């Protein structure tokens, strides 16, 4: 039995990183993919979208795209660059909303992002929230959005927890179904393993087929 994403994609499953600027999206992308992107602590550190493969499953391809950070009252000179980079997120299977949980204005930042997602007619794309920079928080943190996870992207154990969280969220966007393949259809089997998540692979001797 294997599973297939609800949103069709010829390139496996696509994750799109979004969030208010300086939330730590590029750091998360680097930690998950070793992409080596520019990640200085400043506004608009990412102006060009960057897509890399993230190793969540053995064969199934999952990609992660970083985009320019959202901001209130975006300067006119950056509107075009902002819109063009967000086009990279318009066709993703799952939005990963990164929030700087240590910022006192994090709730306002969340609202800014959600409002812009709605304005761009991307609200139907499933979204999960990653509350980042929890190592900088004093006291208890109360998240506003769910499903969500609280991490510090510079903590190795937290990065592993994030990977496990994303794996479960990817699976949650999929529909299970069963398919039979003849033993001679090795090319088709390889393609399925790359483009879908194979939960189990069995061989039926009587039918001489894989299931």
PLM-predicted stretches and their roles:
Residues 123-128, 133-183:
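Canonical P-loop GTPase G-domain recognition
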Residues 11, 37, 103-106, 178-182:
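Conserved phosphate/pyrophosphate-binding and hydrolysis machinery centered on Walker-type P-loop NTPases
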Residues 79-82, 86-89, 107-111, 124, ...:
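Amphipathic alpha-helical transducer elements in NTP-driven molecular machines
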Residues 28, 66, 85, 96, ...:
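Conserved RecA-like P-loop NTPase ATPase core
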Residues 57-61, 82-149:
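Conserved C-terminal guanine-recognition region of P-loop GTPase G domains, centered on the G4
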Residues 1-79, 86-90:
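Conserved G1/Walker A P-loop phosphate-binding module
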Residues 170-211:
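Long, well-ordered amphipathic alpha-helical subdomains in the mid-to-C-terminal portions
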Residues 20, 101-102, 154, 184:
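Structured loop/turn residues at secondary-structure junctions
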């Amino acid at each position: 039995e294997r599973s297939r994403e609800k949103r069709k994609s010829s390139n496996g499953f696509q994750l799109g990183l979004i969030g208010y600027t300086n939330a730590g999206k590029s750091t998360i992308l680097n930690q998950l993919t070793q992409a080596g992107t520019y990640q200085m602590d400043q506004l608009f550190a990412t102006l060009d979208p960057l897509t890399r493969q993230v190793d969540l499953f053995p064969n199934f391809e999952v990609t992660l795209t970083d985009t320019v950070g959202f901001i209130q009252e975006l300067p006119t000179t950056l509107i075009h660059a902002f819109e063009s980079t967000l086009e990279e997120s318009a066709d993703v299977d799952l939005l990963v909303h990164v929030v700087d949980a240590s910022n006192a204005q994090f709730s306002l930042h969340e609202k800014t992002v959600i409002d812009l997602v709605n304005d761009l007619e991307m609200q139907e794309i499933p979204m999960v929230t990653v509350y980042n920079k929890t190592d900088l928080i004093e006291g208890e943190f109360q998240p506003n959005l769910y499903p969500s996870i609280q991490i510090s992207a510079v903590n190795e154990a937290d990065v592993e927890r994030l990977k496990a969280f994303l794996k479960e969220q990817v699976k949650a966007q999929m529909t299970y179904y069963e398919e039979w393949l003849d033993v001679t259809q090795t090319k088709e089997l390889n393609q399925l393993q790359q483009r879908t998540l194979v939960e189990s692979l069995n061989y039926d001797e009587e039918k001489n087929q894989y299931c």
